[in-house]
């Protein structure tokens, strides 16, 4: 389980990205890099980390499912992920 402060920081970044998305796109299109540089650092989508929705783990996350590899395997074996089954050939 990730620290709650790390999860909260990432959620704050997600909100900032949403808040400044339109302004950032306009400035980028206009080529106003000086104004773009003055925006908050955390308003850049690059700083957002994909995290597991259950554990907060930041590495080994399947973005399509929003789960880390451990939880993905657990739920897949329990049959809780529709359409996912263990490969066999």
Curated annotation (Swiss-Prot):
Function: Binds 16S rRNA, required for the assembly of 30S particles and may also be responsible for determining the conformation of the 16S rRNA at the A site.
GO molecular function annotation: rRNA binding; structural constituent of ribosome
Oligomer and partners: Part of the 30S ribosomal subunit. Contacts proteins S3 and S10.
Gene coding for it: rpsN
GO CC list: cytoplasm; small ribosomal subunit
Record protein name field: Small ribosomal subunit protein uS14
Entry similarity comment: Belongs to the universal ribosomal protein uS14 family.
Lineage: Bacteria, Pseudomonadati, Chlorobiota, Chlorobiia, Chlorobiales
Entry keyword annotation includes Nuclease: no
HAMAP family, per the entry: Ribosomal_uS14_1 (MF_00537)
Protein keywords: Ribonucleoprotein, Ribosomal protein, RNA-binding, rRNA-binding
InterPro entries to which the protein is assigned, alphabetical: Ribosomal_uS14, Ribosomal_uS14_bac/plastid, Ribosomal_uS14_sf
Source organism, top-level taxon: Bacteria
GO BP term, pick one: translation
């Amino acid at each position: 389980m990730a620290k709650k402060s790390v999860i909260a920081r990432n959620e704050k970044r997600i909100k900032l990205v949403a808040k400044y998305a339109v302004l950032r796109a306009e400035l980028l299109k206009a080529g106003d890099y000086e104004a773009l540089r003055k925006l908050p650092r955390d308003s850049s989508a690059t700083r957002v980390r994909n995290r597991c929705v259950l554990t907060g783990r930041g590495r080994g996350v399947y973005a399509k499912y929003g789960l880390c590899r451990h939880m993905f395997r657990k739920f897949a074996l329990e049959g809780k992920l529709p359409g996912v089954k263990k490969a066999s050939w």
